[in-house]
Amino acid sequence: LITSSNATARMLKAYELAPEKFGDKVDYLGHERPNGIPDVLDEAKWGLDWMHKIHYGPDMLFHQVADDRDHLGMKWPDKDSSDYGWGANSYRVAYFATGEPQGLREYKSKATGIANLAGRSAAAMAIAARIWKNEFNDPVFAQKCENAALELYEMGKRQEGYQQGNSYGAPYRYNEDTWADDMEWGAAELYKNTGESGYLEDAKRYARMANTVSWTDKEDAEHYRYYPFINVGHFVLYEHVDRETKEELAGYYRAGIEHTLERGSKNAFKIGVPFIWCSNNLAVAITTQMILYEKMTGDTQYHDFMLAQRDWLLGRNPWVTSMFMNFPVEVEYPQDGQTSVWYL
């Protein structure tokens, strides 16, 4: 849920901001036939359906299925040798979001709550409620998402703090240790849906807690420490607040951008991210942050720097290789996304 909540919410927000950018070539199952729904929403609904499954009651939330016992080298998906105690290629464990340290062996997480998961899951559900209500005239699914958003947000308020990923025998995990940004995002989206002032006040309070906390001023960080690497909540809240608060929110974004601008001035490609594990995620995040900053303020002073980060990902790098499969067609790009299938 750490990653799926973010991926789902980001796809939904991208569609909401620019629906004209997304086409309809396949159906929900990926068959090459249009189904009247933009493909990005077909993909996002896989995330929503998964999130509904693991949040199957008002106070219920699972956050992880399986662990590093899956890390057994190259294997076919239908002949999985992973064994969780029920034999190979069988059942897997599911971890409930308790908000407390978890881990079945020596490498325990440092969890303190569940608000990171609950907050951004609430954001995803709130956006989905708007889209399925207004775009697809599906009040049943829209209400299901709205109810989930309200429930998840309340769960986050009751257990402020962060739930981390769990490992079994490996010393690494998803070390996310921030949560106020996620609750800000959830509160801002719910205010947009309900107009209830309590959500607006919550969002402003969480925004000031989240402030400028980010990877942007760090040269190193634990794996996934500042996930999801950008605070979308500042952007969503911006349109609902007074001039003074707008300046605060824009200032938070600007501070992070300035840190990366300084770092980028020290290399030929003007890349502003530290080259650590998941540095491409950071490049996407700071590019997105500058796009949202421009939308908020109209200030384009960082535009060329933003293009440099984007172009690095698209092939203007020492390898002349795109970091995306099948795009852009003019440069080399990865063609074997599933290493096991290619190897076997």
Regions found by a protein language model. Give the residues of each.
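Alpha-solenoid helical repeat scaffolds
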Residues: 17, 21, 54-57, 131-138, ...
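Aromatic (Trp/Tyr) and acidic
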Residues: 1-6, 64-120, 124, 170, ...
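Extended, hydrophobic/aromatic-rich amphipathic alpha-helical segments that build helical scaffolds
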Residues: 4-19, 41-54, 118-130, 148-156, ...
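Acidic, Ser/Thr-rich low-complexity linear motifs
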Residues: 165-176, 217-224, 268-277, 326
